[in-house]
Every structure is written in structure tokens, then in C-alpha cells.
């Protein structure tokens, strides 16, 4: 048995039904007939509502489109994995030896899913309002500055607006290579403009590498 009491202290919530928490921590590789996927589904919906309601009140004058971008910047695998890491969640997940040897305890997807499952489990046991308190505390701790300019770094859109306006060209993003083990895959992206390479970047996902390349291009153009 893992020391789940330590995790409960980090969550500031003690489960009445310990089996519910164990269920939320059980990856499908450990036991296919008993895993956290259904709780993950529930937790995803709960977090979507929690963050949506929070942003609705915090940014009372912002348009729907801006609120949607903010929510997307918070409700995603990368953000949830960051929160999960702050809880050392990887230490508590039940998974197969094969998955663990493949870096499963550090995989953002597994960490994110487990966090969602825990939120779903708390919701089942304690209700929405209590779960909202815990979820917002975790979010605000890991993202102390919930600000559109900080969270929404859409360099690709900004670059495209500039290049289309000035030269009538749309930047193209080409995958140069993908390398590294599955749990630490890296992607190298080249940003092409009018047939010439303007910038290049490497990151853990294609989207992130594209944004990084766009940022480099904007810096070269003096637009940042």
C-alpha cells in the first residue's frame, strides 16, 4: 500500500472511502478492469466547469472568445501535469512494471489523467462546492498570475497577422525530426516563410515547438 495519507495532506482532503482514492490512482496498465478512466472523465467535466465559472467572475468584462482561450490555457494536459507534479502524484499512481519502466511516473498524460480522476473522486464524495475549493486552491498555487497576457502566448496567430498584413504570406511549420524515447519525445520544427527558414525550435510537442519558433521569428522581426 502506498502512503496515500501523504497525498491526502497535500490535497488537504481526507477520503472517507480510501478505495475511491485508490481507484482514482489506478492506471489502466495496472488493472484493466479496474482503473481511473471513468473518474478521469468525471473530473475533466468538473474542472472544466470550475475553471469556466472562476474565469467568468474574475474577468467580468472579457468577451467569450477571450474566456475560452484562458480556459484552454488552464484546462489542458500540460497545466494539469504541472499541478500533479506539485503534489508528487507520480509517486502514488498504481501502474504496471512495464509502464513504470517506460517512464510512466513522469508522463504528462498519465499525471494529468490521475489528477482529473482525483478531482472526480472528491466530487463524488464531497460534492461540487467543496471540490471547487480544492481545485481552485491547486490552480492558484501553481498559476499565481492568471492573466491573459501571461497564459495565452499565441505567438503563431500574432506572427500570421503580421506576415499576411505586410507581405501576404502565411508561415508554414515543418517537422524536421522527432527524437527521444516515447515518454520524453522531442520535436524539432522549422518555421518557413516565403520558402525560407525564419526560425527553428525544439520542444516536447509539435504545438509547443511551433509557438516557440513563432516567438523567435517575432523577436527577429522586432515585433515583441
UniProtKB/Swiss-Prot annotation:
Residues 154-223 form the DRBM domain. It catalyses: Endonucleolytic cleavage to 5'-phosphomonoester. Mg(2+) binds at residues 40, 113, 116. Its cofactor is Mg(2+). It is an enzyme of class 3 (hydrolase). The active site is at 44, 116. It is found in: Cytoplasm. One of its GO terms (molecular function) is double-stranded RNA binding. Its EC number is 3.1.26.3. Keywords: Cytoplasm, Endonuclease, Hydrolase, Magnesium, Metal-binding, mRNA processing, Nuclease, RNA-binding, rRNA processing, rRNA-binding, tRNA processing. One of its GO terms (cellular component) is cytoplasm. Belongs to the ribonuclease III family. Digests double-stranded RNA. Involved in the processing of primary rRNA transcript to yield the immediate precursors to the large and small rRNAs (23S and 16S). Processes some mRNAs, and tRNAs when they are encoded in the rRNA operon. Processes pre-crRNA and tracrRNA of type II CRISPR loci if present in the organism. Homodimer. This is Ribonuclease 3. It comes from Campylobacter jejuni (strain RM1221).
